Every structure is written in C-alpha cells, then in structure tokens.
C-alpha cells in the first residue's frame, strides 16, 4: 500500500502547503507563494510539468540559490531556465533517456524542449545511451558530492 503523497512534515508545519498537500512556488525563483522568503524545491513543490526527480531538484536548487543571492544583493532575478535529464540502464549496453527544458513564462513553468529515447532505436543508439547514462551519473554525482 502506498500512502497518499504530499510534501514533508516541515513544509506543512511551516504553513506553506496548500489543500493538495504540496507547496505552490513562484516558478521564477521557487519561493513559496504561501511564505515570503521561504524557498522550496524538489518533490515538495507544485512545479508541473517538471517531474519529481533528483535531477530536477538539483536544477531547482541552483535557481533558488541564485534567486536568494539576487534578493540579498538587490539584483534582478536570474532567468529561470531549468532542466531534467534521466538515463536508465536497462542492460549493460542498453540505455534509455528522457529530458526536458523548462522556463518560467506567464507565471507558470513551461516545457520548451525535451524528448525521450526513440522506441524503435537500434542497438548502436541504445549502446550510446548507456554510455551517456554512465557519464550523466558521474556528472550529477560530482555536482552533488564533489569530485
């Protein structure tokens, strides 16, 4: 049994969740719409069409940090350009991927580019995706934990 999904206890306790149990955010900064100077990212947010993924949260965190720095220094907000990329290794030489690029437009996040691995891709394509997947994993790991 999977329990109902929602933002964590701390978000609810801080009063930034809405009736859905998630945190609505400003797509330009990931500042909560329900709490000034409260920035939320990742699975806790209402950030559709972005998926709830670690890579998406990583780019959201970078945007939030840049927005906080801009706020503290009196600078304009950075342009909200976010990405999600995910590779899955189905076999040793068989990879698949999904990617999306998102921008804040008209008060909402909009997917402006992206795609998935072609369903009928040949073995060479799948092998390349497996190689890209290994490089992607190394890059995101280094970005998060350092090299």
Where do the protein language model's features map onto the residues?
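Generic signature of intrinsically disordered, low-complexity segments enriched in small/polar residues
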Residues: 12, 33, 42, 58, ...
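FAD-site-proximal beta/loop scaffold in flavoenzymes
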Residues: 1-62, 70
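C-terminal auxiliary extensions adjacent to catalytic cores
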Residues: 98-147
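A conserved FAD-binding loop/helix module that cradles the flavin
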Residues: 44-84, 88-90, 98-99
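FAD-binding beta-loop-beta segment adjacent to the flavin cofactor pocket
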Residues: 21-39, 90-111
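Broad hydrophobic/π-residue packing in well-ordered secondary structure
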Residues: 1-2, 35, 39, 63, ...
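Glycine-rich beta-alpha junction loops
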Residues: 3-6, 86, 90-94
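Generic serine detector
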Residues: 20, 29-32, 53, 81, ...
């Amino acid at each position: 049994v999977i329990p109902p999904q929602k933002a964590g206890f701390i978000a609810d306790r801080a009063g930034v969740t809405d009736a859905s149990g998630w945190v609505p955010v400003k797509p330009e900064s990931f500042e909560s719409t329900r709490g000034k100077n409260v920035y939320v990212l990742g699975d806790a947010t209402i950030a559709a069409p972005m998926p709830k993924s670690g890579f998406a949260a990583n780019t959201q965190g970078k945007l939030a940090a840049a927005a906080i720095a801009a706020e503290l220094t009196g600078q304009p907000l950075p342009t909200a350009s976010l990405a999600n990329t995910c590779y899955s290794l189905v076999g040793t030489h068989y990879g698949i991927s999904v990617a999306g690029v998102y921008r804040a437009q008209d008060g909402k996040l909009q997917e402006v580019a992206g795609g998935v691995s072609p369903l009928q891709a040949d073995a060479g394509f799948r092998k390349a995706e497996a190689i890209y997947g290994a490089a992607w994993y190394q890059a995101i790991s280094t970005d998060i934990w350092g090299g």
